[in-house]
Amino acid sequence: RSVSRGLGDVYKRQPEDMLKAMRLYRAIKRVCKDEILRVVTLSCSKMIERTGTTGCLALAMLNDEGILAGCEGDLQSIFTLLAAKALTGKVGFMANPSMINTRTNELILAHCTIGLKQTEKYIIRNHFETESGIGIQGLLPTGDVTIVKCGGECLDEYYLSTGTLTENTNFINMCRTQVRIKMNTPAEYFLKNPLGNHHILIQGNYEVLLNEFLQANTCKRTE
């Protein structure tokens, strides 16, 4: 069932799951405050093993509060988030290409966390891979989007494309937040030689702005 933003729906989660996730959020936020951090990334698998909960809720809340927070120690994606925020003023959605259809030129991006402010509605669920803890199923507005990723050993390569977010999907075999994108460039890139797994989705068309910045810094565009 749908819910209004800021309220949230809880889907088969126990109170202790929320308590553990909130304790982790408070701990990470305290570290960020003490160390004066504006950007952070977690080692998600180790975090689950050591704390018995997931970082998905913590990352969502930190991003909403202006601390750029990413998953799985992915520094290239964190840099991409940082550059995108500086240029566009928007927090991106870090996600995995989870379904690629080269015939229709469509892509589904999915992940178990997203800043709640990026969503129209959201549902509190569990983490897909472990079926434990807290995961976020965010429902995003349809419309123009930009997909970008900075990569390469020296962060001197980048992928940049635009498309249209056409649908929020709800497949059982992928992460909780899922969006279908009709790409404006060939989706084959994600199968052939992508710049890593995570890519960043920004709501709106910022191709010209991002391309000018990356070209000015002598980065090479890959397609």
Locate predicted features.
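Extended hydrophobic packing segments that form well-structured cores
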Residues: G135-E223
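Single conserved hydrophobic/aromatic residue that forms the stacking wall/gate
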Residues: R1-Y11
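A short, gly/pro- and small-residue-rich
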Residues: T53-A69
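Active-site loops and adjacent core secondary-structure elements that bind or stabilize anionic groups
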Residues: V10-K29
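C-terminal catalytic subdomain
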Residues: G66-N170
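Hard-cation-handling environments
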Residues: V31-T53
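Short acidic, glycine/serine/threonine-rich loops at helix termini
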Residues: R50-G55, N105-I108
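Flexible, glycine/charged-enriched surface loops at secondary-structure junctions
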Residues: E35-I36, S43, K90-P97, E223
